[in-house]
Amino acid sequence: MLALSTGYRVMIWQRWGLRLCSKKTYCLSLFFHSQFGQTGAENEKKCVPLQTERRKKTMREYTDEELSQLLDKDIFHHISEAADELGVECYVVGGYVRDIFLERPSNDIDVVVVGSGIAVAEKLRKILGKRAHVSVFRNFGTAQVKYKGMEVEFVGARKESYSHDSRKPVVEDGTLEDDQDRRDFTINAMAICLNKSRFGELVDPFDGIGDLWEGIIRTPLDPDITFSDDPLRMLRCIRFATQLNFFIEEETFAALSRNAERIKIICGERVADELNKVMKSQYPSKGFFELQRCGLLPLIIPELSALDIVETRNGRAHKNNFYHTLEVLENVARAEERLYNKEKTENLKTGAFQPNVWLRWAALFHDIGKTKSKRWDNQQGWTFHNHNDIGARMVPEIFRRMKLPLDSKMKYVQKLVELHMRPIAIADDVVTDSAVRRLINDAGDDIDDLMTLCEADITSKNQVRKKQFLENFRIVREKIADLKERDYKRLLQPVIDGNEIMELFHLKPSREVGELKKALKEAVLENIVPNEREPLMALLKEKAAQLGIG
């Protein structure tokens, strides 16, 4: 398990109400003590009741009778009818049950049948008639029914065993108990009976309700077996802890560290899918903090993990760029929420909040080049010159290795990483029109996202300097808005393009054509001439004459 760095970091997560304590406070005792002068146990007393009070607002306890009322929907009664006609036990399980208690709406329903899940699905099709669409996957023993916007997955109760080099299980028919044993976490192992005689009866052998109430992620059985059998569950563990703002039970967390190397057998696409779900969470930094703490991050994104270091020379230390990165990521998430709430208030936005996951990836990778660019200078101390350019060059390879998309999404992240120092440089100096024009031209349609990222990057603990930066950023934003409004045409490419230059001077693609294009673009950006044909043509001929082009 990785040791935790000390310093200001904990304030990031405490400020946003994140759970970082385990149920037994072994992991952060010294961390809290170093920051607040109190023990982990003392902090746990403050943390857990606070979170439990929050849990009371987002979770309810139900009797079986109340659960039956919550399941009083046509689809569940039809499933009950189908199962009873076939004489088999039938249960709704997993995330749908969990989300009932968390009062989160869900249209994805998993049903376990002690017998043939396919048979119940086919019987349900006969009951529903043409209103239902049924897909059967006989090789997997599963079936899916789509009905009135809901998706119901049917599977027979089963028990599983695994070989060491594969996460593909050997499956046998089993009981409900066998099926609950194989579930990843206690909060996902609860079941509610759908048979008419027991409709609404909760079956919770591992106290998933208690773990939901306490905000704990825990495995039903030995976590070493759970994670070794299917290493993807390690990422699911982190993901659920992040999405639900739960903490990971001590022994479960220790098993993450012991089995971290097993993640190597998981294909990149599955890893990327889980990480994107972490990214979409309300507090994404929590997930990457836990990945680093348990030792998974060095195996998945070693370039990011490598930032978790503080080096000191001649009494001068640089900041921990890993924790800085997580703070920037969290700042971006909060900025997105503020913008969404503002637009929703002004009726400019409807529907659920949809985070910009690629802006968040840009935040995570914005300083990725600092490890390679770090140098010591006797006068300046630690420097990270050109880390933005180095980081931008690293992005495509990281995306390729992680099986993230290599299309416009990767180029968007790469662009923001490359440009993320530009607004800061402008804000740190006299804010000129020409500098802002160049920034808008280079960032294009992504200028607003770039400004969000760069403002999130202002994490200085020097409040005077931070206040000045933010004030200058306000000026930059105002100037961007002003230039967009009055100079929009000027921000476009010059009205005379390379093809016309080649035709006019009878040139082939060459360095000379590039120089002439550059001269026109510079003149437009610097406001030397208007972006109009006549003045640009005069400038073009003048520049061509200087280059000896007739």
Regions found by a protein language model. Give the residues of each.
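Short, low-complexity intrinsically disordered segments enriched in A/P/G/S/L with frequent Arg
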Residues: 4, 20-21, 39, 47-48
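Catalytic cores of the polymerase beta-like nucleotidyltransferase superfamily
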Residues: 13-17, 26-32, 46-49, 53-550
